[in-house]
């Protein structure tokens, strides 16, 4: 199953809504659970996989005060469930993980996002009603002091697979993430703490990060 769309869509990951910005692709590597048999006779082993689909979306987060970023950090990019919607099609999946997440911004502009993720498990396709009802709210940060910034999270999390029947062993699972931040900041020394706290809250949902 391959699906591409060039219009606004709605994405919901762990309860947070993201509205697409004219760019979305969704490609399923196979439509049913994949099983590979290795060996012969009593040495035969079954390798059971899951449905896997790769999706990418260029998006703008519209929910004011969203803690989507901190969820990605806390869960190493793991998505417990989610749905991808547009004007007439909806995709649901059980689990997935974030490959990478990038947030860009500048003076007098709302931040823009880029998210790439892999969904797996029960992936379904169904007709739905239009769901374009997210209200836009501006971020309440002192962006006039921030010239530009680029914030990204990349994860190496992979789904688990089971090998064997009597004594199953989990294989092909790697967890971890990398965070990077490029920031061009112009602010007087007396206002540094206030501006940095606002920016930290913007990118993480809290102001307890340390940016040096």
Model regions and ranges:
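Signature of extracytoplasmic/envelope-associated structural regions
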Residues: 1-212
């Amino acid at each position: 199953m391959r699906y591409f769309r060039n219009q606004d869509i709605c994405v919901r990951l762990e309860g947070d809504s993201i509205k697409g910005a004219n760019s979305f692709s969704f490609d399923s590597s196979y439509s049913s659970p994949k099983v590979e048999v290795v060996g012969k006779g009593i040495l035969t082993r079954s390798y059971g996989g899951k449905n896997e689909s790769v999706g990418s979306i260029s998006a703008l987060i519209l929910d004011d005060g969203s803690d989507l970023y901190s969820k990605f950090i806390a869960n190493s990019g793991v998505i417990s469930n989610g749905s991808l919607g547009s004007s007439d099609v909806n995709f649901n999946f059980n689990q997935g993980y974030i490959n990478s997440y990038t947030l860009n911004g500048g003076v007098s502009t709302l931040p823009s996002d880029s998210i790439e993720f892999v969904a797996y498990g029960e992936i379904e396709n169904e007709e739905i009603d239009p769901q374009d009802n997210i209200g836009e709210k501006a971020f309440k940060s002192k962006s006039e002091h921030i010239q530009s910034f680029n914030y990204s999270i990349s994860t190496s999390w992979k789904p688990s697979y089971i090998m064997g029947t009597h004594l199953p062993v989990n294989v092909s699972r790697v967890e971890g993430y990398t965070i990077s931040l490029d920031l061009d900041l112009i602010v007087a020394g007396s206002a540094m703490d206030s501006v940095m706290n606002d920016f930290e809250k913007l990118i993480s949902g809290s102001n307890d990060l340390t940016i040096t």
